[in-house]
Amino acid sequence: MEQRVLKTLEYDKIVALLIDKASCTYGKEKASELIPFLRLDEVINAQQGTEQAATVLRLKGSVPLGGIRDIRGPVQRARLNAMLAPMELLDIASTVMAGRRLKTFLLDMCDDHELPLLQQQAERIEGLRELETEIRRCVDENGDILDSASLELRQVRQEIRQLESRIREKLDQMTRSSTYQKMLMENIVTIRGDRFVIPVKQEYRSVFGGIVHDQSASGATLFIEPEVIVEMNNKLRELRLREEREVERILYVLTEQVSFAVEALVENTEALTELDFMFAKAQLAWSMKAICPRINDRGYVNMRKARHPLIPREVVVPVDVELGGEYQAIVVTGPNTGGKTVSLKTIGLLSLMTMAGLHIPAEEESEMTVFSSIFADIGDEQSIEQSLSTFSSHMTNIIQILAKMDDKSLVLFDELGAGTDPTEGAALAMSIIDHVIDSGARLVATTHYSELKAYAYDRPEVINASVEFDVQTLRPTYRLLIGVPGRSNAFAIARRLGLPEHIIDVARGSISEEDNQVESMIASLERNRKSAEADRLAAKAARQEAEELRTQLEEERAQFAEEKNKRMERAEDEARIAVQLAKEEAETIIRELREMMAEGMEIKEHRLIDAKKRLGNAVLELEKEKVKKPAKAVRATQIKVGDEVMVTSFGQKGTVLEKVNNEEFLVQIGIMKMKVKRDDMHVQNSIQQKPQAAPYTSVKRRSDNIKMDLDLRGYNVEDSIREIDQFLDDALLAGLHSVSIIHGHGTGVLRKGVHEYLRSHRNVKSFRLGGQGEGGVGATIAELK
């Protein structure tokens, strides 16, 4: 891509915006080198990288890119075993940690989302935790080597501190001494040339003694090292040299460790460069409200509500452009008001951005193509008195474009043919457009020559376009109108500015009838377009209103369904509670009767009537709380005396004893006899197939919890009889036909007592000792009636 074209279309300004979005030096450098790709696969890959990074920003809002330093220089020096400075080591540690943090962040995102390009780069980053830990163990945030870096360093620094303390103590004694105070300029201890000194007045030089290391600017003060601390200062100097050697040794060790990780650091650097660059593109897209366009290599462009990215969003006017489908060229006609050039640059710049892997400010579903090259001849016409040199300059550029273009090129001409005689200029413009079309290239050209309006109508590959102009404000609206040629609007503008009407009429009369017809036709087209646009907007508004109404109805329907479900759940909960209460009431009745029987009490008639009444009330409560009755397996007219039936409200089996009337039957349920409505039961032995499932509320059968055997081992005879009596009642209510009573071998007393009780029990049909696998003589099997 020619650099002149990139500059003409202001691509360099887009790159500057991209550089500003990068977080580190690596990303900024890569952004500065970005040029459009020329291969479809490269463009698609670059766009996918931008889209995946944009997805992360949409989901997370930000990305941990802080802490990345430019470590390429230190890494290369470490490769050569050149000692690294502490701050360089800190930069390496910071970058290692930043890379590891970014890797963890991205791989966590990749667990939930498809982000293959980001994942590929993240997986290149090596953690290098040991290297970072070792650097931070030895170097603090200010770049100083820590005492913990080595035992030798800790020891020598401790000696230095102790010796410095002794020296200061010695000098403090001198400054406080009355003998020396009159000789001192100030009672302080200071350092000159790494040696402790005190300020002495010039006149006491010979009296004070010692070594002079410095003097004040006036010469009145001498900084003297007293003789009593010379040896101590010498020792201090030796210790500091030891410290320097140890620090240097530590830095060499750390540098060596960096050299071992050079390849990994280079790989990390490259991965961080790619990631920072991708997120810079995503940040730019976010700031522009840009989208990822569809990409093709057919030369087809369909921009929807495309905006020039360098014009503020609050003032830019979107344009719709379709090129390369039905039409190969667009000729934008009309007066040179400036709006045409903006449209031309928008088409060119967005094409460059697409090919560079950048998202474009347009609506979703916009489609762009990959051009082999983009050429542009764009220059503002300053006046009607353009010089021949300007025309020659443009023509030289056009000649070069025509020589280089091919069938996959995009050619942009601004004010084609301007700067020369209008008749000749228009003829040249039409001939140049013909040549570009014949080459197969895509073309967008602007012109103010009216001759090209009719030309565009005559060529099926070419379509007219214009930039809308508001005659009232005398300003272009910058809306690109495809299919509508531009009008000069000269008469309308003159009238608006106050030119006398008779002058305008004379001017209009001097124009040929054909030109007047063309202008009238264009005016008619413009009126029809505005009418169609108004209808389209009205239809769009109606469609949007209908869509909003549909969405509202869907939401209301969903809310209604949710509320209905909640009410059903509440009803079912209430029914379950009522069922449980009714069940407990029924069990209480049965338990009371059982206790009365166990105590040998005669059950009076009024007691039995009261129990039946209470049980009947419980059944009625169950029936009231049913959500839905199950399908009847057999019609009520088919129920007859002797049938085994399932009583729905209790979930219990029973036997029909007699038919009371057409609505009720007398049913034996365990030890109880009760009236049951015909709709509350069905014949158990007549069900041939499972009825259609229907939700209903029922009592939970006791057989869900009752056991088939009763273990009496350890009980006496009296307690055993009470347990057997309750066990048999539960078994009968559960519909069991036989049970096992375990009494053990023992002395036989318990077995004998069990047998005597079973023999007299009214609901025991027969009993026997258990066989093999049934407990033998230690168990008794009872058959129930």
Curated annotation (Swiss-Prot):
**All residue ranges annotated as the Smr domain in the record:** 710-785
Coiled-coil boundaries: none
| EC number(s) reported in the record | 3.1.-.-, 3.6.4.-
Q: Which Pfam families match?
A: MSSS, MutS_V, Smr
Q: What superkingdom heads the lineage?
A: Bacteria
Which sites bind ATP? 334-341
PROSITE patterns assigned: DNA_MISMATCH_REPAIR_2, SMR
Question: Which GO terms fall under biological process for this protein?
Answer: mismatch repair; negative regulation of DNA recombination; rescue of stalled ribosome
The GO terms this record gives for MF are: ATP binding; ATP hydrolysis activity; ATP-dependent DNA damage sensor activity; endonuclease activity; mismatched DNA binding; ribosomal large subunit binding; rRNA binding
Enzyme category, top tier: hydrolase
| Keywords for the protein's UniProt record, in alphabetical order | ATP-binding, DNA-binding, Endonuclease, Hydrolase, Nuclease, Nucleotide-binding, RNA-binding, rRNA-binding
Task: State the oligomer form and interacting partners.
Answer: Homodimer. Binds to stalled ribosomes, contacting rRNA.
Q: What does this protein do?
A: Endonuclease that is involved in the suppression of homologous recombination and thus may have a key role in the control of bacterial genetic diversity.
Q: Which PANTHER family match?
A: OS10G0509000 PROTEIN, OS10G0509000 PROTEIN-RELATED
The protein's matches in HAMAP family, at most eight in alphabetical order, are given as: MutS2
Q: Which family does it belong to?
A: Belongs to the DNA mismatch repair MutS family. MutS2 subfamily.
Q: Which NCBIfam families does the entry mention?
A: mutS2
Q: What is this protein called?
A: Endonuclease MutS2
Provenance organism: Brevibacillus brevis (strain 47 / JCM 6285 / NBRC 100599)
- Which taxonomic lineage is given here? Bacteria, Bacillati, Bacillota, Bacilli, Bacillales
Tell me the name of the encoding gene: mutS2
